[in-house]
């Protein structure tokens, strides 16, 4: 009898899982080089993104909102960060700016992009119930969970790959299951739309796109 009960329970859970997965589609963005499972076809809109150091960058928001909750992916392109910072620094010098006001801080803006993206979650009017490091296909990032005042829960993840910052977010109603399928489905694509598989941890700050100079050898004091 116990074996039958366990089998029945397992069957019910399997059916529930299948039912929950129904309606999800694997969405691919060749423009922003990612793929993720959304609960329906997402709407896409352009939006400005203000970097930590005050540079306005282009971004796309892919979103679906239905009875399951609100699911979104925000992608910010940091490609022109160096150019924009250089132009701002030149204007500052021309205007006779003083001290550090005219520094070109583009490398810091890029290196701090994940932390800045994570801060957009942390500063909300919500209780942080989890915060930690994680990887998506060996691309490191930050992962967090929030409990909102209305009892809903927000699950967020922030990664950087190539020149783009990715902010994955799902908010589900009070009592709803965690959006595991959505969270675990993120993949990064190459220029030909193929899924990228790394053999070791990817480092966004030393990727081919940025070509940051290698640090000089350390010196003993």
Enumerate the language-model features and the residues they cover.
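Short N-terminal segments immediately surrounding and downstream of signal-peptide cleavage
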Residues: 22-41
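Surface-exposed amphipathic alpha-helical segments
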Residues: 30, 42, 91-97, 101, ...
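Conserved polar/disulfide-associated segments of primarily extracytoplasmic proteins
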Residues: 48-157, 221
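Sec/Tat signal peptide C-region and signal peptidase I cleavage site
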Residues: 17-21
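Bacterial N-terminal signal peptides
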Residues: 7-16
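N-terminal leader/targeting segments
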Residues: 41, 46-47
């Amino acid at each position: 009898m116990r074996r039958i009960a366990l089998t029945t329970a397992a069957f019910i859970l399997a059916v529930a899982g299948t039912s929950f997965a129904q309606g999800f589609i694997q969405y691919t963005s060749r423009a922003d080089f990612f793929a993720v499972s959304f609960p329906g076809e997402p709407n896409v809109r352009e939006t400005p993104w203000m970097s930590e150091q005050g540079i306005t960058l282009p971004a796309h928001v892919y979103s679906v909102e239905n009875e399951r909750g609100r699911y979104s992916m925000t992608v910010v392109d940091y490609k022109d960060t160096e150019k924009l910072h250089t132009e701002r620094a030149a204007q500052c010098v021309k205007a006779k700016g003083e001290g550090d006001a005219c520094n070109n801080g583009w490398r810091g803006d890029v290196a701090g992009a994940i932390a800045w993206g994570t801060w957009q979650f942390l500063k909300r009017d919500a209780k942080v119930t989890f915060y930690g490091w994680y990887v998506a296909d060996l691309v490191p990032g930050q992962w967090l969970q929030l409990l909102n005042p209305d009892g809903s829960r927000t699950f967020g993840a922030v990664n950087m790959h190539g020149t783009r910052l990715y902010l994955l977010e799902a908010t589900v109603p009070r009592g709803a299951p965690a959006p595991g399928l959505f969270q675990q489905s993120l993949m990064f694509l190459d220029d030909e739309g193929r899924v990228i598989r790394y053999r070791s941890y990817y480092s966004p700050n030393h990727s081919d796109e940025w070509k940051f100079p290698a640090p000089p050898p350390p010196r003993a004091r």
